[in-house]
Design a protein with these regions (language model features):
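A short acidic/basic microdomain associated with nuclease active sites
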Residues: 116-130
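OB-fold/S1-family single-stranded nucleic acid-binding modules
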Residues: 80-93
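Short aromatic-glycine-enriched beta-strand elements
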Residues: 37-42
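Domain-level recognition of nuclease-like catalytic cores that cleave nucleotide substrates
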Residues: 3-6, 11-12, 196-253
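Nucleic-acid nuclease catalytic cores
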Residues: 159-169, 179-208, 230
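Beta-strand/loop nucleic-acid-binding surfaces
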Residues: 49-62
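Flexible glycine-rich surface loops and low-complexity tracts that mediate binding to linear polymers
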Residues: 68-77, 230
Length: 253
C-alpha cells in the first residue's frame, strides 16, 4: 500500500498562518525483518526484501521487532544507496510511533512559530549558537529571550514515556548548558516531543542513565522549564498535540 503526499501541503494555523504539523511524501507500508546495524534495516515491501535507512540511531529494540508493520518514505534521490527511510512503526498494543529522530526539531519549530508555546508573537531561530553551545531553537520577542532544547521520545512501557533509551552524555551536556543560560538571564526550556499518543506521563529513564535524570532534576530546580507533549501520529505525518505530565521523582534504586 502506497500513500502519496506532498510535504508542501501542510495545514495552517488560522491565527498565525504557520504550518502545524510535518508531512512526509510517498509513504509505503512494509514488514520489519532485521536491523544489521544502527543505520540500516531489512524490510519486506510488496513481497521483496529491501535494505532501508533507519532515521534513528537509538536502540529502538522495543519497536523494531521482526514482523512488525512499519511505514517508510521513498527517497526522491535516485543516487542514494537506500531507496527508503524507515520513519514509523505500528507497535503492538500501542499503535503508531514515529521514530524519525529529525522530525521533532522540525515539528517543534513550526509548533512554536504557530503560537502554541508563547502568548505573544515571537521570532524563532533554529540551531542558534550561544557561547560554546548550539541550541535547537532561540526565541525572542519584546517580552522574552529563550533557548529551547528539543528531545524526541520514542521509548514507552506501561503507558509511561521515558528518555533516553541509551546513555546520553550529549543530553546531560545540553541540560547543563540550559542551566547556564538561566544563570545568564535567559529563559530556558527542555521540550520533550513524545512521538506517539496515549501515554500517562513522562519520566526519565533512571535505569538506563541515572545521571541524565539527576541533571534533569537539577535543571528544574534551577528554573529550566521541563515540558512534555504527545503527538498525533499517522503514516504520513506527525503533529504535536497535548501536554503530558512530567514526573521527575526517582523510585529506582
Amino acid at each position: 500500500m502506497v500513500y502519496t503526499m506532498c510535504k508542501k501541503k501542510q495545514r495552517k494555523n488560522r491565527k498565525c498562518g504557520q504550518a502545524e504539523y510535518m508531512k512526509y511524501e510517498h509513504i509505503t507500508e512494509g514488514r520489519f525483518i532485521e536491523r544489521p546495524n544502527r543505520f540500516i534495516a531489512h524490510v519486506e515491501i510488496n513481497g521483496q526484501v529491501e535494505t532501508v535507512h533507519v532515521k534513528n540511531t537509538g536502540r529502538c529494540r522495543e519497536l523494531l521487532i521482526p514482523g512488525t508493520q512499519v511505514f517508510l518514505e521513498k527517497s526522491s534521490n535516485p543516487a542514494r544507496k537506500t531507496a527508503y527511510d524507515l520513519i514509523c512503526v505500528n507497535k503492538k498494543g500501542r499503535g503508531l510511533i514515529n521514530m524519525d529522530s529529525q522530525i521533532p526539531n522540525k515539528a517543534a519549530l513550526e509548533w512554536v512559530k504557530a503560537g502554541h508555546l508563547f502568548p505573544e508573537k515571537v521570532q524563532v531561530t533554529p540551531e542558534k549558537t550561544y557561547g560554546n553551545s548550539r541550541f535547537d531553537l532561540y526565541v525572542c520577542s519584546e517580552k522574552r529571550k529563550a533557548f529551547i532544547e528539543v528531545k524526541g521520545v520514542t521509548l514507552e512501557s506501561d503507558n509511561i514515556a521515558r528518555f533516553p533509551d541509551a546513555p546520553t552524555e550529549r543530553g546531560v551536556k545540553h541540560l547543563k548548558e540550559l542551566i547556564h543560560c538561566m544563570q545568564e538571564g535567559y529563559e530556558a526550556y527542555l521540550l520533550l516531543v513524545i512521538q506517539m499518543k496515549g501515554v500517562d506521563r513522562f519520566e526519565p529513564n533512571w535505569e538506563t542513565h541515572r545521571e541524565f535524570g539527576e541533571t534533569l532534576q537539577e535543571a528544574e530546580r534551577a528554573g529550566v522549564h521541563i515540558l512534555a507533549y504527545d503527538c498525533l501520529v499517522e503514516p504520513d505525518r506527525m503533529e504535536i498535540q497535548d501536554p503530558v505530565p512530567v514526573c521527575l521523582a526517582s523510585d529506582w534504586k
